[in-house]
């Protein structure tokens, strides 16, 4: 089986907008497909429709889409003078095309526009490629935090907390 070469997000006419309630089923499919790589850590899906609705009450999802559908999304939330970025998910068929980097940049621009002085995020320690990815985007590790007691992790781990000042 051969795969078509991955194209850059600029070639795909990808645009970004805030998700609305009708987008929840597509968001859930995208996030769970992208986070399937975490099944060695957690058994359950990464997000349910109910959880996505709850996230949309405190923040918003920015979605990158094109004529094919949703290509990527990221959750953004204002927390006083800081932004919180989470659930960065890129369609597995489009990973490695720069969409994740593009969407992080859009999220940072959103936070700047809201007057935030920094962006915070957290990744699970078992996803070893993630800290270097975020470091390349200017984020630094500022600490760790335990998983919530309700999360049943199959392997030991913790959150790595990262932050980036916004100019």
Regions found by a protein language model. Give the residues of each.
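Conserved GNAT acetyl-CoA-binding A-motif
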Residues: 111-123
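A generic structural signal for beta-strand entry/edge sites
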Residues: 80-82, 118, 159
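Residues at secondary-structure transition points
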Residues: 43, 47, 98, 125, ...
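Conserved glycine-rich acetyl-CoA-binding loop
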Residues: 91-105, 114, 125-132, 136
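Acetyl-CoA-dependent GNAT
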Residues: 3, 9, 21-24, 28-93, ...
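Terminal substrate-recognition subdomain of acyl/acetyltransferases
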Residues: 2-7, 153-167
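Conserved catalytic-core motifs of GNAT/GCN5-like acyltransferases
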Residues: 120-124, 131, 135, 140-157
């Amino acid at each position: 089986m051969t795969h078509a070469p991955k194209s850059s997000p600029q070639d795909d006419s990808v645009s970004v907008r805030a998700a609305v309630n009708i987008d929840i089923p597509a968001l859930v499919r995208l996030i769970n497909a992208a986070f399937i790589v975490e099944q060695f850590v957690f058994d359950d899906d990464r997000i349910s429709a109910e959880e996505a609705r709850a996230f949309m009450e405190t923040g918003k999802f920015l979605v990158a889409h094109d004529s094919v559908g949703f290509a990527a999304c990221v959750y953004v939330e204002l927390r006083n003078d800081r932004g919180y970025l989470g659930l960065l998910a890129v369609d597995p068929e489009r990973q490695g095309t720069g969409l994740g980097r593009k969407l992080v940049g859009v999220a940072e621009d959103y936070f700047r526009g809201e007057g935030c002085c920094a962006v915070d995020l957290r990744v699970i320690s078992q996803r070893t490629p993630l800290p270097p990815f975020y470091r390349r985007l200017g984020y630094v590790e500022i600490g760790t935090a335990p998983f919530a007691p309700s999360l049943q992790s199959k392997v030991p781990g913790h959150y790595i907390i990262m932050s980036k000042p916004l100019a």
